[in-house]
Swiss-Prot record:
Expression sites (tissue/organ): Expressed by the venom gland.
Signal peptide range: 1-21
GO molecular-function term, one example from the UniProt record: acetylcholine receptor inhibitor activity
Subcellular location: Secreted
A Pfam family reported for this protein in Swiss-Prot or TrEMBL: Toxin_cobra-type
Disulfide bonding pattern of the chain: 24-41, 34-59, 63-71, 72-77
Protein name in the entry: Mipartoxin-3
Function: Snake venom neurotoxin that blocks neuromuscular transmission, presenting a postsynaptic action through the nicotinic acetylcholine receptor (nAChR). Has no cytotoxic activity.
Keywords: Acetylcholine receptor inhibiting toxin, Disulfide bond, Ion channel impairing toxin, Neurotoxin, Postsynaptic neurotoxin, Secreted, Signal, Toxin
Any one of the GO CC terms: extracellular region
Similarity field: Belongs to the three-finger toxin family. Short-chain subfamily.
Superkingdom, taxonomy of origin: Eukaryota
Residue ranges the record marks as coiled coil: none
Length: 79
């Protein structure tokens, strides 16, 4: 009985991911787990030459300012 209870506790901890790791999309739109301390996902559109733009996405420590910056704090919110 104790073994079953211990097994259930371990499974619960693994499933809940008590580390509270944030997940964001990177520039290739793949899911990545953010390192500890990075509490935000971001998506920045940077102007480039000839009317093109560069998309930068991923985890960040803080949110940038500007009309082309998007920052959020929930899993996979920077799509």
């Amino acid at each position: 009985m104790k073994t079953l209870l211990l097994t259930l506790v371990v499974v619960t901890i693994v499933c809940l991911d008590l580390g509270n790791s944030l997940k964001c999309y990177d520039k290739l739109k793949k899911e990545v787990t953010c390192p500890e301390g990075m509490k935000f996902c971001h998506k920045d559109v940077l102007p480039a030459t000839h009317g093109n733009s560069v998309l930068v996405m991923g985890c960040t420590y803080s949110c940038g300012l500007g009309p082309r910056n998007m920052c959020c704090s929930t899993d996979l919110c920077n799509k």
